[in-house]
């Protein structure tokens, strides 16, 4: 297989990771792939000896397979094509990728460029044509420019429609304002660039985008350093950008830094322009000392920077904007316009998220809580190496634990081997990433998803302080509890005079959790909120079981009752059961869990016939009894003296007993 194919697969994965798109998200999607390339050296090398002709040469080295291999490997269903227009190939691909999004042919577009050199014969033919530099330097705009230096590179970019990228919370680095492609047509020679055709293309691209060329402050030129190419391109740039501008236009070419990547050179220029927009710095050119005499830099208002320059906008209120130009030796020209993303009022972070205004209490909660940071890799050793790189990055760069946890949890593909770190403090996070505790050692994930069962309790298991830490540290849990309060306050009758949130936060002296009309809806609300939080984390039950009023939360988890219906049923159940205990003249009741068999319980209750009865069989050796409070207290003391498990439930009445006949109101 051509190394280009293997490297392209790797670079595409890195581009998706940078964009915050997981493999699960993109697999099977309507994603287009366009690959720009020029030469096919590996094929030329492997087919020199026809007696040794690999069986899979066609699929392993064919240029068309470069794009198709990516679509095949990642299971992408949009358009897939390899483009060869020589040096403008990848910028033409960029145009096609943007076009596929505009025409709704794709929801995502992956644009790649590739240039790997193995065959020395190509160097010879290019030297014969006078394309290559005689001194091994690419000198854009310089009098000593004699051609370009061939560079190697594999590059990838991911495109999305802006509204979709913002809605998905993707990492947006720049905005594409316009793209265009044309051809020189007939001219003096097929390899001779045309200033007129390039100027026409730039003009039409800006007109379609509804932009004014004079507002652009940087142009990334094709800039090969050839005697024929540079003067014509810079003349075209002057014609379009500088005739009506008051200031100087900065121009440059990444080829002076990394050489000419030929089929991948357009993407290299796009990447340079994107980073310049992000950093707000215009990068310098190398190997520029004496201006080319055929270029009137002063009167054309052009400047090639030789030192980094802060990208000042002066009094301009428009965003920073850059143009990227590229042309092939066969006459195909391409142009793209990029704009900084910050101009749209959104902050660019490690993982771009839609702007959300949180109440101060929720914002503080997000900052101070501990976070789970999942770590993942293809092997234990690879995971250890990656973890060290991550720890080094976090040491050298400022980042919040919340941001890092978000990126690792939702914007990274989960591979077979896993580890994790949990903390609210970045120093401890770094320490645990480098030296994970035994429970967080790198391990292979299970081949099958474990079956999880949820057990839901009824009243009596509540305790002072329950759910308080979740209310204080988990915004989703707090919001769900407040949703419960809104539902209860919207009831047409018998709406509560209290709130679930307030009751959970009361002091131990003031809490009313022991009263049935409070405990049943509150226990249900807490369990409903837990179901939603766990589901948000991706934890869903394979089976559920509910005990007593816990059946209501269980039916919600099973999808049999809606959230609102489960809560309202629990509330009215508690209201009517609690009203029995509060009725004038009603006898105080109690409930108790005992660790005995049915026969043993029956024998123990014989002296209390009519006063205590079995309320529930929890297991063959665990029963709940219910009855008059004084009788339950007496039985508890007797069992405790004999060291038999007996624990009072936190209820104020004897449910499932004669005391609860008031339920007939239903």
From Swiss-Prot:
Disruption phenotype: Impairs the production of pyranterreones. Keywords: Ligase, Multifunctional enzyme, Phosphopantetheine, Phosphoprotein, Transferase. Pfam families: Acyl_transf_1, KAsynt_C_assoc, ketoacyl-synt, Ketoacyl-synt_C. InterPro entries: Ac_transferase_dom_sf (IPR001227), Acyl_transferase_dom (IPR014043), Acyl_Trfase/lysoPLipase (IPR016035), Ketoacyl_synth_AS (IPR018201), Ketoacyl_synth_C (IPR014031), Ketoacyl_synth_N (IPR014030), Malonyl_transacylase_ACP-bd (IPR016036), PKS_assoc (IPR032821). SUPFAM superfamilies: FabD/lysophospholipase-like, Probable ACP-binding domain of malonyl-CoA ACP transacylase, Thiolase-like. The active site is at residues 87, 222, 260, 548. The N-terminal part acts as a polyketide synthase and includes a ketosynthase (KS) domain that catalyzes repeated decarboxylative condensation to elongate the polyketide backbone; a malonyl-CoA:ACP transacylase (MAT) domain that selects and transfers the extender unit malonyl-CoA; a dehydratase (DH) domain that reduces hydroxyl groups to enoyl groups; an enoylreductase (ER) domain that reduces enoyl groups to alkyl group; a ketoreductase (KR) domain that catalyzes beta-ketoreduction steps; and an acyl-carrier protein (ACP) that serves as the tether of the growing and completed polyketide via its phosphopantetheinyl arm. The C-terminal part acts as an NRP synthetase composed of discrete domains (adenylation (A), thiolation (T) or peptidyl carrier protein (PCP) and condensation (C) domains) which when grouped together are referred to as a single module. Each module is responsible for the recognition (via the A domain) and incorporation of a single amino acid into the growing peptide product. PytA contains one module and terminates in a thioesterase domain (TE) that releases the newly synthesized peptide from the enzyme. This is Hybrid PKS-NRPS synthetase pytA. It comes from Aspergillus terreus (strain NIH 2624 / FGSC A1156).
């Amino acid at each position: 297989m051509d190394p280009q194919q293997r490297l392209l697969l790797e670079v595409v994965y890195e581009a998706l990771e940078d964009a915050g798109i997981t493999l699960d998200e993109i697999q099977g999607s309507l994603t287009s792939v366009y690959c720009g390339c020029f030469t096919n050296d590996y094929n030329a090398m492997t087919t020199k000896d026809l007696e040794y002709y690999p069986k899979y040469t066609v699929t392993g080295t064919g240029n068309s397979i470069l794009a198709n291999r990516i679509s095949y490997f990642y299971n992408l269903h949009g358009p897939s094509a390899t483009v060869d227009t020589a040096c403008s190939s990848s910028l033409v691909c960029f145009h096609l990728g943007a076009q596929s999004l505009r025409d709704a042919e794709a929801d995502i577009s992956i644009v790649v460029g590739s240039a790997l050199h193995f065959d020395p014969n190509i160097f010879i033919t290019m030297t014969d044509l006078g394309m290559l530099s005689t001194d091994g330097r690419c000198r854009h705009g310089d009098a000593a420019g004699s051609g370009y230096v061939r560079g190697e590179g594999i590059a990838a970019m991911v495109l999305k429609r802006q509204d979709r990228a913002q809605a998905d919370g993707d990492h947006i680095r720049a905005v594409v304002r316009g793209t265009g492609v044309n051809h020189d047509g007939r001219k003096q020679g097929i390899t001779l660039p045309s200033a007129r055709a390039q100027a026409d293309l730039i003009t039409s691209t800006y007109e379609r985008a509804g932009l004014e060329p004079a507002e652009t402050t940087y142009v990334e030129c094709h800039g090969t350093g050839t005697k024929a190419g540079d003067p014509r391109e810079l003349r075209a740039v002057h014609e379009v950008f500088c005739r009506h501008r008051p200031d100087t236009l900065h121009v440059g070419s990444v080829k002076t830094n990394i050489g000419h990547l030929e089929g991948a050179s357009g993407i290299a220029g796009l990447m340079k322009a994107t980073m310049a927009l992000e950093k707000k710095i215009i990068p310098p050119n190398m190997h520029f000392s004496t201006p080319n005499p055929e270029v009137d830099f002063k009167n054309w208002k052009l400047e090639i920077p030789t030192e980094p320059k802060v990208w000042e906008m002066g009094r301009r209120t428009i965003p920073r904007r850059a143009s990227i130009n590229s042309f092939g030796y066969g006459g195909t020209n391409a142009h793209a316009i990029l704009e900084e993303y910050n101009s749209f009022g959104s902050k660019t972070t490690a993982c771009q998220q839609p702007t959300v205004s949180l109440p101060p209490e929720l914002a503080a909660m997000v900052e101070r809580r501990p976070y789970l940071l999942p770590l993942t890799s293809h092997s234990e050793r690879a995971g250890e190496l990656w973890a060290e790189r991550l720890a080094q990055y976090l040491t050298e760069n400022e980042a919040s634990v919340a941001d890092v946890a978000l990126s690792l949890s939702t914007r990274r593909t989960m591979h077979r081997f896993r580890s994790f770190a949990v903390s609210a403090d970045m120093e401890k996070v770094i320490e645990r990433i480098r030296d994970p505790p035994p429970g967080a050692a790198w391990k292979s994930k299970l081949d099958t998803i474990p079956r999880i069962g949820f057990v839901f309790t009824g009243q009596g298991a509540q305790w002072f302080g329950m759910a308080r830490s979740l209310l204080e540290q988990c915004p989703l849990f707090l919001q769900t509890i407040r949703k419960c309060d809104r539902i209860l306050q919207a009831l047409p009758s018998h709406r509560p005079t209290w709130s679930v949130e307030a009751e959970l936060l009361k002091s131990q002296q003031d809490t009313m959790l022991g009263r049935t009309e409070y405990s049943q809806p509150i226990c249900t609300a807490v369990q409903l909120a837990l179901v939603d939080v766990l589901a948000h984390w991706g934890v869903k039950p394979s089976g559920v079981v509910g005990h007593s009023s816990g059946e209501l939360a269980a039916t919600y988890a099973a999808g049999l009752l809606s959230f609102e219906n489960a809560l309202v049923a629990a509330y009215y159940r508690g209201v009517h059961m609690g009203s029995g205990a509060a009725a004038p003249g009603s006898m105080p009741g109690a409930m108790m869990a005992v660790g005995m068999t049915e026969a043993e319980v029956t024998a123990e209750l014989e002296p209390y016939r009519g006063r205590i009865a079995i309320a529930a069989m929890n297991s063959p050796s665990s029963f709940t009894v219910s009855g008059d409070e004084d009788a339950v207290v007496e039985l508890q003391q007797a069992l405790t003296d004999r060291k038999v498990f007996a624990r009072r439930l936190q209820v104020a009445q004897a449910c499932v007993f004669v005391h609860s006949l008031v339920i007939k109101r239903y």
